[in-house]
C-alpha cells in the first residue's frame, strides 16, 4: 500500500502548568496554559493510557495549580477538582458536564499555589480495595505528597468525610495565605487568613496531621504556622544551605513528610531537607541548574523527587531505607542521599505527581457475552500479560512529570534510574482534522484542520512521482468570533459545508468556488437556529443534515436547506415511549453515521454507546462500557452499514451488528484471542480508516506511534515470537532458523539473516493485525484509494522548535 506523507500542518501544543491525582490515584488531571484540562487514566506501560476527558476552560485565565479532593457525600465518585488562577479566582471542573465553573470570584490578587488539608484521624490499619484492585501500598497513608495538588487519599478515616469540610489553603501574591472551606455548597466559603508577610506567598503545604501550615515566599523565608491559632511558630532562611542570598531566593515548592521532615525547592536550584518540628537544616543538595519548580514523594515517604527549569527529575532517598520501608528514623538523625537524575523533557518541568495503574474490569456486559465456558477457555489460552512492561505493574505507584514541552512522562518510583520513562502522550493536543476525498469541486481533495480559534480548509496535492509526498495549500481560513476557543468541527462529504462550535454556540458555513473572480474560494455563514454549544458534530452521509451533540446532553439534527431543527434525541439507557426523558447521561463526545444514513452512533465521554435509527427517529440500542474501558475510535463500515467497529483504550476491537443488537460473528469468535502484538499496540488509538473498495473488509487502526491493518475477512493468527517486544525466539522459530542453515549463537551475520528471514516472510504474505511503527508522531491517517493512504505526521523536533518557550539545552555561541 502506498503511503503519501505530509508534514506541512501547523501543530503547536500548549504547555502543561499543573498536575493533580485523583483520590484513588487512578487518574491524573493535567492543566494546560491555554486553559484546557485533561483527565488521563493511569495504566501500566504503554497500553491503556487514555485521555478520557478534555474540558475547554477560559484561555484568558492561566491556571497556577490544581487540587483534587474526594467528595462521595454529594454523589461525585471522582471527587471535586479545583484550580487556582493567576487572576485570583478559583474554579471547579465539572467532570460530568465537562465545564469549568467559578466557585471563588477573583480576589484581585494572583494565587500561586493551593494545598488541601489532610483529613486527620486516619487509621493506618485499614487497607483499601479501590477501583478494582487491592492496594499494594502496605501501611501507607496513600498520601502522594505532590505540592501541585496537596491531595491525599482520604477514603479511610475514623470520622465520615460527609461530616468534614475540607480546608483549602491558597498562597497569594500579596504575601497572605488564605483559607477556604470546601462544603457541599457550590461556592467556596472564606474561613480565615494567615498574617500577611513581606514578599509574595509562592508555595504552601500542610503537615500530615493538618496541625501546621508551611508557606514559602519571595523573600527567601519559609514560615511555619499553627493551623488553629494562625500564629507563626518559626521561620527558616532558605539560603542557609543553598546558593545565593536569602533576599534573592524564591521558595517555589514545599513538601511535608510523615517523618517530620520539610522539603523545600527554590530559585537557586537547591533542594533542602529541614526538621519540621524545629526548623533546623538536615541536608542541602544543589544539583539542579535552574529553579526547582516542583516536588513529590513516594507513598512510603522515603523517596523525594524534584524537578524544575533544567528539565531534570532528581531522586533523593532516605539513607538506610528499603523499598516500601516504613521504619522512618527521627528527623534529626536522617540523611537524604542524592541518587541520580533522569532527563526526558526538552523544556522546563512544571509539575510532578504520583499515580497508580488500575486493573481492568470484566470485559463485557453479561447480556452480550458468548457462553461462559467459551469465555473462560479463551481467556485461559490467551491471558493479558503485563510483564513486558518491566517496571510498570498494576497497583504499583509511578511518578508523572509534565512541563513546557507539553509532554507527560511516567517513571518507575522504585527503580527510577534503571528504566527509561514512558512517553504517555507522544502527540499532545493532536490537531483534529477531517479529509474529504473527491469533493464536489472537480474531485479536489480537501482537509479541514481545526486550530485553537481558527478553521482552515486546505487543498491536498498528491505527488505523481515516486517520492510519496503530499502537500497542502490553504484555500480559506475562518476565525471564531472574539478569538473564542473552538471545541469541535466537521465538514460534509462533498466539502460544500463545514461547521464548528465554540463555548457560545455552533456556526455553519458554506464553501463556494467561482473560477472567474480574483479570489475563487469564498465562505458564507448560514444562520442556525438557537442551539447550545456542542461537544461533537457530524454531517449526515448525504450532506443534508448537521447533527450536533449539545452540552445539555441532547443530540440535535438540523436540516441544511431550511436551517430548521428537525428533531432532537435524548440518549438514555432504557427505552422510553412518548415524551423524551430528562437528560441524565454523560455528555456525548463522539458521533458517527452510517453511509446509508440510517444509523447514528453517539458515544459519551466514559465509553457508553447509544445507537439511533435516523429513519424512525428513535433510539435503537444502548451498549454499556466495553471491557471497562473508554472508546478511543469508532466508525461504520462503508460497505456494511450495520457493522459498527469500536476500538477501546485497552486495545480491544469490537464489531457490532447494530440492526440485530448484538456482537458480530467476527467479535464472537476473535475478541478474546486478539494477537498479543495488537494488545501491546503502542500508543492510544486515535482513529480508524476504512478502505473505499466495495470488496474490502479491512480497516487501518492508527495511533500517534503506529498503524495496524485489520482484515475482518481473514483469520486471526497466532503471534510469532519475533513479533514480541522482548525479542526472545521461540523453539519453533529456532527450528526454522536451523533449517535455513543458521546456527544458534550471536553475531551480526545471524542478526542479518534473521532480519532477512522476517522481511521475506512479511513480503510474501501480509499478516492480519500487521503493525507498522511510525518514525514521527502521526496526526491523521485516511484512505485516498484502495491501495493508497494519506499520513499526516510531524517530526517532534520541528514541534519543539515552534514552541514559545525556549528549550533547556541552549547552544552557547563559541562552544
From Swiss-Prot:
Q: Which InterPro entries match?
A: PCN, WD40/YVTN_repeat-like_dom_sf, WD40_repeat_dom_sf, WD40_rpt
Supply the alphabetized keyword list: Developmental protein, Nucleus, Repeat, WD repeat
The residues that cross the membrane are none
Note the PROSITE patterns from the entry: WD_REPEATS_2, WD_REPEATS_REGION
Taxonomically, which superkingdom?
Answer: Eukaryota
One GO biological process term is:
meristem growth
Effect of loss of the gene: Temperature-sensitive phenotype. Defective in embryo development and embryo lethality when grown at 22 degrees Celsius. Embryo lethality phenotype rescued when grown at 29 degrees Celsius. Germination of temperature-rescued pcn mutant seeds give plants with small and narrow-shaped leaves, abnormal leaf vein patterns, altered flowering organs and defects in the root apical meristem (RAM).
| Cellular component, GO annotation | nucleus
Q: What is this protein called?
A: WD repeat-containing protein PCN
Q: Which organism is it from?
A: Arabidopsis thaliana (Mouse-ear cress)
The gene for this chain is PCN
